[in-house]
Amino acid sequence: MKVTCVLTLAVLILTVGQMVTADCRSPGSWCFYKHSNCCSGNCFLWCVQNGK
């Protein structure tokens, strides 16, 4: 039971991590949905800096 929880958590962290750090122009990135005219690079930092 405990192993399943840990695995689920790991998958969640990886998925969110990929979305956050993905290229802004990538449809899978978090920023793509928040702000379609996103610059390339670290979407999360860009969004935080620009208040998106």
UniProtKB/Swiss-Prot annotation:
Tissue expression summary: Expressed by the venom duct.
GO MF annotations, alphabetized: toxin activity
Endpoints of the signal sequence: 1-22
Domain of life: Eukaryota
Subcellular localization(s) per the UniProt record: Secreted
Key words, A-Z: Disulfide bond, Knottin, Neurotoxin, Secreted, Signal, Toxin
Cellular-component GO terms for this entry: extracellular region
Disulfide bonds listed in the record: 24-39, 31-43, 38-47
Domain writeup: The cysteine framework is VI/VII (C-C-CC-C-C). The presence of a 'disulfide through disulfide knot' structurally defines this protein as a knottin.
Its job: Probable neurotoxin.
Stated name of the protein: Conotoxin Cal6.36
UniProt organism field: Californiconus californicus (California cone)
